[in-house]
Amino acid sequence: MSSDVPLLNDYKQDFLLKRFPQTVLGGPRLKLGYCAPPYIYVNQIVLFLMPWALGGTGTLLYQLDILRDYTAAALSGGLMVFTAAVIQLISVYARSKPVVVRRMRTRDILAEEDQHEFTSCAGAETVKFLIPGKKYVANTVFHSVLAGLVCGLGTWYLLPNRVTLLYGSPGATAVLFVFGWITLCIGEYSLIVNTATETATFQTQDTYEITPLMRPLYIFFFVSVDLAHRFIVNIPALEQMNQILHILFVLLPFLWALGTLPPPDALLFWAVEQVLEFGLGGSSMSTHLRLLVMFIVSAGAAVVSYFIPSTVGVVLFMTGLGFLLSLNPSDVSMVFRYGVTRHRVGSSHEARPGNSGHWFPWKECFLFIAVLGMALLEAGLLHHYVSVPQVSRSGAQAVVGYVLMVLLSIVWILRETQSIYIFGIFRNPFYPKDIHAVSVFYDKQNKLLKIGAVRWILLTLVSPLAMVAFLALDSSLHGLHSVSVSIGFTRAFRMVWQNTETALLETVVVSAVHMVSSTDCWWNRSLDTGIRLLLIGIMRDRLIQFITKLQFAVTVLLALWTEKKQHRKTTTTLCVLNTVFAPFVLGIIVLSTLLSSPLLPLFTLPVFLVGFPRPVQSWPGAVGTAACVCTDSVFYHQMVPRLTAALQTAMAAGSLGLLLPGSHYLGRFEDRLIWIMILECGYTYCCINVKGLELQETSCHTAEAQRVDEVFESAFQREHPQVCSLNEHLENVLTPCTVLPVKLYSDARNVLTGIIDSPDNLKEFKDDLIKVLVWVLIQHCSKRPSTQENKTENTGEASPALPPAANSSPCPESLEDSESANSDWSDGSIFDDEPAIKNRKEKLQSKDLPCTKLPIPGSVDSQNPDDHSAGTGPKNDLYRTVILGLPAVDKGQREDVAYIPLVEFSCSQSRLLSLPEEWRSNSTPRSKILEMSALFPEDWYQFVLRQLECFHSEEKSRVLEEIAKDKALKDLYVHTVMACYIGLFGIDNGVPSPGQLVRVYNGGLPWAGTLDWLSEKPELFHLVRKAFRYTLKLMVDKASLGPIEDFKELTNCLREYERDWYIGLVSEEQWKRAILEEKPCLFCLGYESSMGVYTSRVLMLQEMSVHIGKLNAEAVRGQWANLSWELLYATNDDEERYSIQAHPLLLRNLTVQAADPPLGYPIFSSKPLPIHLC
């Protein structure tokens, strides 16, 4: 990115000057960008000031002592309801009146959609422009009533006498009154006239018109505090809050314009998430529905615990329910469904194999039951027999506190040994040195994982039970019930299981503070242990957020100064301003930390704003429902099960660090990038979302991908790393964690220059093609069920005599043609031909059931059920010559047309390998087939027959020998193989060109008289294309690995293709299916038109090393929050979004890709994936 690229080019500047004032004022469009009549602006000003006029009427009557304060508020509200209703009715009438709006001619294409021609001050087109109206009638009524409430309560809120009582200053009253009513007018205008485009946008589409409610919602909040202060007197804190909020009230327009205040839907989910996590001890959830359900259940648990009379009962209830609520809700529902099913089925469940326990998580279930039983027994006994009502520093609880300190130290040390860097700074001396020696590397890593197993035992079994003992011994549980005890201890007993590692840290901090502080201090005297843990939990979370936000801000500032490509003309100015106003910048960081909202760097420059608070997911839609799917998405789809299995081991051992909802990880292998986000965490499980980023690397993508490779290489691939050396890329948002062995597809692309265009290879290709055709057809016929054998059993009727072939009348539509309409023209039969053939044979058998005329034993049946149904009998069908599809010919040419008379095999078993009758009829001249038959490899043909495994009798070798000597069968294969060969290359037996090979490989046939004959037989066509692709792959292998020595080696090679390879095209559905079924190898041929070369692509399924690194979560949230701003106001010299430009330190391009569509464009996004850490 060059330094002179403007953040806002000309048309974006004009757009900003139109859009931003509209956002600030709540909707009035005072700058249109084209000439409009003055009444357009006058009307908007009148509508904007209408609430002030109505509220001013009530205020004036109150100041003149004509009305009481609440009466004046009611009068203003009533007038506003009437006015809003009239405005909405006018809008409905204008929209129902047909009007032709003519566009104004202009050269500014970008602004055309906003330009209209107005005819009168109160015309329909003017009204529709000023007041767009509501989509729903209910909203029309609701918003009108709501506007009246806002106006009435706002009048009451800003009464001069009331404001003077708060501040005692007429000057302050005047200022707050004027600017306060501007705030009210902004809120009213967006509600009843025209809604502004909000910078704080959460949903991509406002389907239910929630956006107009955003500004009135915050007005109601400010008014509610004032009402509470009015009716609840003698509370100094409430009075001070009311004074502060009155000042903030006049600043609301700027907070709305800057996008600091969240929209209602984001505010709801954020508030529920915060209360669930910090007030009730839960975790953010993977879906909004699970979040709401878990919040209701958790809140209900806290309420129920308040009404339990027995202290032992309270302890047991909190322990048991805290454990159950920390489990994966999906697992709990599975156990419930299993129990209901067992109850319904009863003793008859043995008759249903589908209900067997192979799918049920018995191991986890037994573990949970055992741990829950131990926890309940421990908590009940300790609380009843050991716990004392007095606080003591030398009691049993203090001893347990020391034990928890030791456990925390051990668990943290063991966790840090699993990652490449200790605290992300110093290289771990115990981690394997070099990944180049793969086997040695993984052997050493497995030893570390054994240490991780010790950590898992301490963290999953020992620590929760120790913390339950610490809480059960607390003296606060012996006192009378209070709200603080119910909330605090409900959360504490839940956190023990929900997030054991953070709960362990919080408990140790509380225990340590209690030991070192005085018993008379406010912390120990006024707060019980549950509330202390709650406050420590909030401080812990906010401290982590503050540190990561500060790291993010420093990285943005350093990148602007150190990265040459990020230099701009304003670089020095921005750096100086950030240094001078460092306290102000620090205050912004603190504010965003307190609100748990993203720190938004405008255009990823050190111009920081506070983004609006939002849930951890950052996006409103369901996880995994949106992605820009392409042909490469299937690689990530195949990868997900393997990756989750590898992540399960790494997460359980602690290789990925502290697992918290909202954490982001980046995986890298070959040219693929994986984005992993933790959605929720619980006892022995976490839920993740995996996104796959594009493989088609752009220049910006490549620049950041190279930096990612550098970060991982410096960590894992240094030949002689120093002990405890520093992380060389400490300033980067990516910190390497570990390497995972995952079975994935490696992708190799090669240029076939010198192979596919070699004359010698092309000549050998033609000879090999005939051999492969023979092998494919014999293998196909040997594996399919034999219908002829079924048809010839128990026959006692004599067959009709053979009529001369020359007198055969033209036959009706053949059986293959009748089936072609229902046949599946797909690539599924290339490697999976048996099921397709079986289905076709079943259709043939079902159609042949009514037939009573059976063929001569040893002959080829050619009955047509259509003829039978017509009553014509099979007399002429047995010996007909199929010549359909041929062009008209004269008698001289007629004699050269190939026909197949009745075939009589010398071996009775030959019929098992006979080709279908419809394949043997073709339009190829018989003389040409006879001429080309010399190319048929008879020795190879006999060798393939002798290698068949379809006969299992004791006389297998004798039967195969007889079949190999059957001349009729051989002639049948010669005729069909050579006809297919001619169908591929035409009548002229020339050397094919590379372009011709690629065309046939892709499924195209050269134009010839045999084209229709071959293409009209889908099954045969697919087999021929399969043989052609095998032959081309064989040519590439011979050029790379050397020539084939003998027939046995060739057979083994073809069997390997059949068993382990899929050879086809990337665009075929079978290619995707082969990847999902994990075919060991895949091959594809292509042509690179830009370079003019032929290429091959080979995929090999093998265990690969996937590098995993942890991203700065706040850097991700901040850049995602910045996207809406850039979509509105940013651009660059390529007319692209500014944010997709490469930023090697922030990984800006990759971060934008990982955002949910339409802002981002990942090519794959998984559903929430549960990972069981046990």
Curated annotation (Swiss-Prot):
Glycans are attached at N790, N1122, N1149. Belongs to the pecanex family. The chain crosses the membrane at residues 40-60, 72-92, 140-160, 173-193, 217-237, 244-264, 284-304, 307-327, 366-386, 394-414, 451-471, 543-563, 580-600, 643-663. It is found in: Membrane. It comes from Mus musculus. GO terms for cellular component: membrane. This is Pecanex-like protein 4. Residues 785-875 are annotated as: Disordered. The keyword Transmembrane applies. It is a multi-pass membrane protein. The keyword Transmembrane helix applies. Residues 785-797 have a biased composition (Polar residues). Residues 798-810 have a biased composition (Low complexity). Residues 835-846 have a biased composition (Basic and acidic residues).
